[in-house]
Amino acid sequence: WVKLCEKTPLVKKGADGIEIKDYKEICLTHHERLDGNSGMVLVSAAIREVDGQDKKHLMIMVPLGMALPPGLRAAVYTKDQWAKIAKNEKVDDKELKPVDLKYSLCHASGCTAEIEADAAIVDQMKAGGGLMVVAMNAAAQPIGFPVPLDGFTEAFAGKPVDNAEYKKARGQLMAQIRERQQAALEKYK
């Protein structure tokens, strides 16, 4: 988990009809899981906070190819439940409090769904072991996307990381993935 913040211009019209540019700080406490071979984002989850707004939002992105009408379902698992999942043990679903998210946007990287993240959701995430995201694929089969919550509480409460440093580290990771792809191609020539 990492916290990223940046000042973003929000343009609105004043009473006289003239556009006013107002800068708001938008922060994302964010986690993404990448495919180590392709670099494609498999799942991404974030809490979005906008300066001056009380409401926070839980945003989840899954890859393209999911059925849109059903939306997403996400549930926070306790640390004990998450440990059971890691061992492929059965978890009692009755204890879960899933939330349904509707897709709001699809783009080249995937489709994003969001919901207001009230204090109960944020508190569950702080205390939880993991967030299980379930989407339906085009064949109407449920696909699970696990998101560990290790480090969420510290990132959410902490200061944002330097955006330039994050961009540099992410660029290095993508370079490693491209090298791996190149090595695999060379192997099969």
How would you label these PLM feature ranges?
Residues 1-189:
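A generic "folded-domain core" signal
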